[in-house]
Amino acid sequence: MKVVKLADIIGTNRDVDGGNWRSQRIVVESDGMGYSLHDTQIKAGTETHLWYKYHLESVYVIEGEGEVETVKDGKVWPVKQYECYVLDKNDEHLLRAKTDMRMVCVFNPPVTGEEVHDEDGAYPLPEHMKPLNS
């Protein structure tokens, strides 16, 4: 067993600033759990294009409100505190924060902890892993 304190992650290579967002990676690939767990903050008034081509993600909103638009069909999903949205089909999406948002994100497969989004809004797949849904 181990205990990870958020305060111990802030300011390390697991505390990643992506411009519109900042994410502290609490559990990562090297922890051997098969998923990663992130505490992510999104800035109010921003729109972020995301497309996790190699990862599935569940997002539990613990503060704030916004909306997620799935690019494929243009459907808009309002999300707010104490709601969870699940990107179970590698959905390309736009995240719009109406207010500052804080969320707990779970990724499968796990990230290493230092990733930032590429030009498509994706995290790279670790070389030794096979993509989900392939």
Swiss-Prot record:
Gene3D superfamilies: Jelly Rolls. Pathway: Amine and polyamine biosynthesis; ectoine biosynthesis; L-ectoine from L-aspartate 4-semialdehyde: step 3/3. One of its GO terms (molecular function) is ectoine synthase activity. It holds the Pfam family Ectoine_synth. Keywords: Lyase. One of its GO terms (biological process) is ectoine biosynthetic process. Transmembrane segments: none annotated. It catalyses: (2S)-4-acetamido-2-aminobutanoate = L-ectoine + H2O. InterPro entries: Ectoine_synth (IPR010462), RmlC-like_jellyroll (IPR014710), RmlC_Cupin_sf (IPR011051). Its EC number is 4.2.1.108. It is an enzyme of class 4 (lyase). Belongs to the ectoine synthase family. Catalyzes the circularization of gamma-N-acetyl-alpha,gamma-diaminobutyric acid (ADABA) to ectoine (1,4,5,6-tetrahydro-2-methyl-4-pyrimidine carboxylic acid), which is an excellent osmoprotectant. This is L-ectoine synthase. It comes from Shouchella clausii (strain KSM-K16).
